[in-house]
Amino acid sequence: MGMPGAEGTVFSILGQPNMVVKIYHDSELNRMRQEKLHSMVANKPRKYTMLDKRSGRHVPVLAWPEDIVMRSRSGQVCGFTMKAVDVEQAVEIHNIESAFARDARPWTKNLGLGLRAHIARNLCFLVNQIHSAGAIIGDFNERNVLVSQNLIVCMIDCDSMQIRDSSKYYPCTMLQPGFIAPELLGKDLSRTIRHASSDYFSLAVHIYCLLLDRHPFRNGVYTGPGEKPPNHILAKQGQWRGRSGGILKIEPSQIDPRILLPRSMMLLFEKAFQKGATDPSIRPSVREWEAELRNFIGGWKSNM
């Protein structure tokens, strides 16, 4: 039984319950795509499993290519094997990034701010492992990230990432409005080299959504002139929900983020969305977010 996706179908492997195989719909992958897969197999992240403390097992957190699969007759590359991710026991991260979506499931309904901060920290761990392999996520959207009931975060569709092999780059041509860094808008992504700073923008969006139940550009009360601009225009202007003196105000029914979160964290959001709109190099890194979240979780526990 296969699980169809946009680019291919994932099948279980007989006799290997911990592995699956992805077979592409396209019967003839171009040379660059084949080279990219070979590069990913040869340059795996240092660590792409995480200890599930409840079960005592190491579970995969990246659906990273393990081995190339070729057609028996032609010898053409047609897919790859990867570690099996338990998608039945997980939800896409957007189901946790809003209170309304969390109410749909008993286990997500009880995810308070402290637990969501823990998920955000696990997401930082995941991004760090990907960057350690010289990869850039690129298509860092709300459907490529899964969260399990044990709060472990996993990323799928890894073969769409930007991969670097020595001095050669294999680009990520995908994008998702609301998560793509503003400096990439309007670019030919098939010829654009992405940098870690573009992932830092997407990471900050996810952390904002996880902690505040709102998107920094989609939500908020628009108080500027005329119609509310599209999300990507607001992002390019550095106009985010909660910006001091900005045009996206906090909804009357919502708590001001400055009351809910420490000033140090709000300054990171300012660097990511406001100052980082014109200078991507100053966006907070994965390590900065991880340290801030670690301190926040510690303070949250002490107040429980």
Residue map of PLM features:
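Catalytic-loop of the protein kinase fold
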Residues: 118, 127-150
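Conserved C-lobe activation region of Hanks-type protein kinase-like domains
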Residues: 196-198, 207-266
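ATP-binding glycine-rich phosphate-binding loop
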Residues: 1-34, 56-61, 71-74
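Conserved end of the kinase activation segment
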Residues: 184-197, 220
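Terminal C-lobe "cap" of eukaryotic-type protein kinase domains
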Residues: 271-301
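Conserved activation segment of eukaryotic-like protein kinases, specifically the C-terminal portion
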Residues: 169-188
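Activation of the activation-loop gatekeeper triad in protein kinase-fold domains
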Residues: 157-162
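Conserved structural core of kinase catalytic domains
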Residues: 60-119
